[in-house]
A protein has these predicted regions:
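Soluble catalytic domains of enzymes that build or remodel membrane lipids, polysaccharides, and related
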Residues: 203-473, 477
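Cytoplasmic C-terminal tails of single-pass
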Residues: 501, 507-516
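Membrane-embedded alpha-helical bundles of multi-pass enzymes
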Residues: 2-206, 404-405, 416-420, 431-439, ...
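Short, Lys/Arg-enriched, Gly/Pro-containing loop segments at transmembrane-helix junctions
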Residues: 495-503
Length: 516
């Protein structure tokens, strides 16, 4: 009895270590090698689990070991951003982490159904399909962890991060299936080598295209305004003066200034000129993109938005964009329209309305800025729609004071830089406190500001208008993995490898009685 218990505990420990390896790559980008084999224990044990229940538990262990440490900053976000008491924030995080672990449990269930003889491509297909379909609040993908391997990032222009996730999962599965079988390992290793060589070639080609595009200088201003200062009405003029001063220090004046999200916390009417404080901004020839809480009337009642405004060189509003993808528990409370009493749990949570759709801010005939507000630069589909609307430059404005100096800042940028590669556009990110940066179309960070310091920097960008395969085809590769998983998993037999010499898998169910 003791030996099976020890064996089970050892298996769960290895599963937890695999999950922790993935988490480490998201907590410390330099730990990216750990992510390559993070799925190996799950792929090794789930197909061989004695029962489906055991496989599900295996998945939950690996999933919790990934989600709990990697995204623990969500506790602080829910507590400070949503205004929930700390015990409530911890409860919500426990629910979110457990929900995220269900992705691993789903994959484990599929692997258990297929059994050990499943095709070696089944596990990576199932994992990639789960990444695409599973509704994680923070939309991380395994491939996102490889930020520092620039040649591999270039696959983003073809199909986003999914081919890289697939290749990483394929290698992990090959290692645990037959670690000494060179033929099994050769295919994923060769695929990764091809992606690396192709990516190196594409970096050179894209750099040449960028050199031919029109230059456009963007001034990013990071005010380092804390939450208390930001919400204090009496400090508003002082805060704006800080942004003015930092902007004046940029010489020569840039073609565009970008200030962070909700620089103006009180409501700006959609049809008004800028507030007098912003209208008096020195250096009027420079257009300005800034964030503000705004409102308009709908059936006589005010409706509130989280907005980005373009102030023209003449001091008048020349465009606006209202955030579409709102953060639950921060900008709205889910189901509060059905159960209004939910608002009493967090009076500080906003009551914003989503905007109508993607938009561009026309700074000039060539400079069409695609505004993204905070979380929106994590969403590939939303950013592609913004580029489809005509954006030649992407600009994120964010208020990251809620996160403090946590892993959230690095993870946000780690995911966001993929949008530059996927669309071959420059991406500038103006944040309130941390990690304001500029990213070029191959994913390099070309400019960045220090954490929790007031500073400004001029980023030399180029205006690009080309279309990538990912923009044209969307998530075709991801959908292919979904269809492949469904086809292979339609029955245990369908998921089995047809490779010569593959032994049949063990039968499940009640064993047949033999004759005495």
């Amino acid at each position: 009895m003791r030996r099976p218990v020890i064996r089970r505990l050892a298996r769960r420990l290895l599963l937890a270590l695999g999950g922790a390896a993935i988490a480490s790559a998201f907590l410390r980008p330099a730990a990216w090698p750990l992510a390559w084999l993070g799925l190996a224990p799950l792929f090794a044990f789930a197909p061989r689990a004695a029962t489906r229940r055991d496989a599900i538990v295996d998945g939950l262990v690996a999933g919790l070991a990934t989600n709990v440490p990697a995204f623990f900053w969500l506790v602080q976000t829910i507590h400070r951003f949503g205004g929930f008491p700390l015990p409530v924030a911890l409860f919500f995080y426990a629910v979110l982490a457990t929900f995220g672990a269900l992705q691993f449990a789903l994959v484990a269930t599929l692997l258990h159904r297929a059994g050990p003889p499943a095709s070696i491509l089944f596990a990576p297909a199932a994992w990639t399909a789960s990444e695409f379909l599973f509704p994680n609040l923070f939309p991380w993908r395994l491939g996102h962890s490889q930020r520092d391997l620039l040649p591999l990032l270039q696959v983003g222009e073809l199909a986003g991060p999914y081919p890289l996730s697939f290749a990483m999962a394929w290698l992990a599965n090959a290692v645990v299936r037959r670690p000494l079988d060179v033929r099994r390992l050769a295919a994923p290793v060769l695929t990764i080598a091809v992606l690396w060589c192709w990516g190196t070639w594409r970096i050179d080609r894209v750099d040449r295209e960028v050199e031919q595009a029109p230059p456009f200088t963007v001034g990013i201003v990071q005010g380092n305004v804390g939450l208390g200062e930001k919400r204090h009405a009496a400090r508003f003029e002082d805060n704006v003066e800080r942004y003015r001063r930092l902007s004046r220090d940029l010489a020569p004046p840039p073609d565009l200034l970008v200030w962070p999200e909700t620089v103006v916390e009180w409501g700006v009417p959609h049809d008004s000129d800028p507030p007098s404080e912003l209208d008096a901004f020195p250096g009027a020839p420079t257009p300005l993109v800034f964030g503000a809480v705004s409102w308009s009337r709908r059936k006589g009642d005010p409706v509130w938005y989280n907005s980005a405004f373009l102030r023209g060189a003449d001091g008048r509003l020349r465009g606006a964009y209202d955030k579409i993808v709102l953060m639950p528990f921060g900008e709205f409370i889910p189901f509060a329209s059905t159960w209004p009493w939910l608002k009493t749990l967090s009076p500080a949570t906003g009551d914003f309305t989503p905007g109508a759709g993607p938009a561009v801010l026309d700074v000039s005939p060539r400079a069409k800025v695609g505004p993204l507000i905070c979380y929106e630069d994590l969403l590939s589909g939303h950013v592609r729609a913004t580029v489809d609307a005509g954006a030649t430059l992407l600009a994120t404005i964010a208020n990251d004071a809620w996160f403090g100096d946590t892993a959230a800042l690095h993870q946000h940028e780690m995911l966001a830089l993929w949008r530059a590669v996927e669309n071959r556009r420059f991406l500038v990110r103006a944040t309130n406190i941390c990690l304001s940066s500029g990213v070029d179309p191959v994913g390099r960070r070309v400019a960045n500001l220090p954490v929790e310091k007031e500073a400004a920097i001029a980023v030399q960008t180029r205006l690009l208008d080309g279309a990538t395969p990912y923009r044209r085809l969307g998530d075709l590769f991801a959908w292919t993995t979904v269809l492949a998983t469904a086809w292979l998993a339609r029955s245990p037999r369908g998921a089995r490898s047809d490779a010569p010499g593959t032994p049949p898998g063990p039968r499940r169910g009640r064993p047949r009685r033999g004759r005495a």
